[in-house]
Amino acid sequence: MSLLDYFRSSKSKTASVAKERLQILVAHERYYRNKPSYLPQLQEELMQVIRKYVQVDQDAISVKFEQDDNQETLELNIILPDSQNTRNTQQDAVRNSF
């Protein structure tokens, strides 16, 4: 009888793990389904505009969209380099343009 109990307990463990994974996948899918399709393009265009003035990496900008019952929020975070690096980059750009 203990041998049968061994197989039964692993089955419920496997079912529990599968259920947990499925819940994660469903939550992930719901998050991306409610996200507007224009966000990647918006992020790229914002990067182009910002790069006109300051040299930043692709990872320096993040766009986050949240949707509640009555409102939608678009959060934009940009990590700008320190002002000394910005000045040097701008001066180099001016020197290289002549």
Curated annotation (Swiss-Prot):
Q: Name one GO biological process term.
A: regulation of division septum assembly
- Which SUPFAM superfamilies does this chain map to? Cell division protein MinE topological specificity domain (SSF55229)
Q: Which UniProt keywords apply?
A: Cell cycle, Cell division
Q: What does this protein do?
A: Prevents the cell division inhibition by proteins MinC and MinD at internal division sites while permitting inhibition at polar sites. This ensures cell division at the proper site by restricting the formation of a division septum at the midpoint of the long axis of the cell.
The record's family statement is: Belongs to the MinE family.
- Which protein, by its recorded name, is this? Cell division topological specificity factor
Query: What organism does the UniProt record list as the source?
Result: Nitrosomonas europaea (strain ATCC 19718 / CIP 103999 / KCTC 2705 / NBRC 14298)
